[in-house]
């Protein structure tokens, strides 16, 4: 079914919204780039650019709080807590789901930098990752926060243990291979498949 946006009045409502209006009413061509969560993909699914990679490569200006061979750190444009720092690997890793066992030293470095930059009591520190589809940018980034949160909404957004937010320790455990192995051991079909091999 094709929805006639003209007839529903949506076009008139969006007329003053500039880029959003143009984007919503444009025709998708097979050769169009797709922009999603700070990353531009071409029609073949190849990454063309990434906001956080641009910061790491200094092709887009961003005031960095820290930089070394592995990571950069900076303040987000909309902080959620008293202190809020993003620690980002220079190597493009899309999300926590793309981490592998060999990434655990990188995760440890991200934590080390986060703790060093926060300089606050551990009881007020939260280190967490948002889980897709709730992540804001498709480039792995650790949220290092010193509570209190700036609003109740931010407290909810960064509630560890919810489907959208995982603790640093939980993600590291999973990336180390221990989490995947534990899940595999608890799935009867996986046990049966291993026994048949």
Q: Residue spans of the language-model regions?
A:
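HIT superfamily nucleotide-processing domains
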Residues: 2-197
């Amino acid at each position: 079914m094709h929805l006639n946006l003209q007839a529903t009045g949506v076009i008139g409502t969006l007329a003053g919204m500039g880029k959003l209006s143009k984007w919503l009413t444009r025709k998708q061509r097979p050769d169009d780039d797709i922009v999603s969560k700070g990353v531009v993909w071409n029609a073949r699914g190849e990454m063309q650019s990434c906001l956080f990679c641009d910061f790491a490569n200094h092709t887009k200006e961003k005031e960095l709080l820290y930089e070394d061979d592995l990571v950069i750190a900076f303040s987000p444009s909309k902080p959620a807590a008293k202190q809020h720092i993003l620690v980002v690997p220079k190597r493009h890793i899309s999300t926590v789901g793309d981490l592998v066992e060999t990434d655990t030293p990188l995760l440890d470095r991200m934590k080390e930098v986060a703790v060093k930059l926060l300089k606050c009591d551990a009881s007020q520190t939260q280190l967490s990752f948002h889980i897709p589809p709730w992540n804001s940018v498709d480039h792995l980034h650790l949220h290092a926060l010193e509570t209190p949160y700036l609003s109740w909404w931010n407290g909810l957004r960064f509630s560890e243990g919810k489907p959208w937010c995982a603790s640093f320790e939980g993600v590291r455990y999973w990336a180390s291979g221990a989490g995947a192995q534990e899940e595999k051991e608890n799935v009867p079909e996986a046990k049966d498949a291993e026994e048949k091999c």
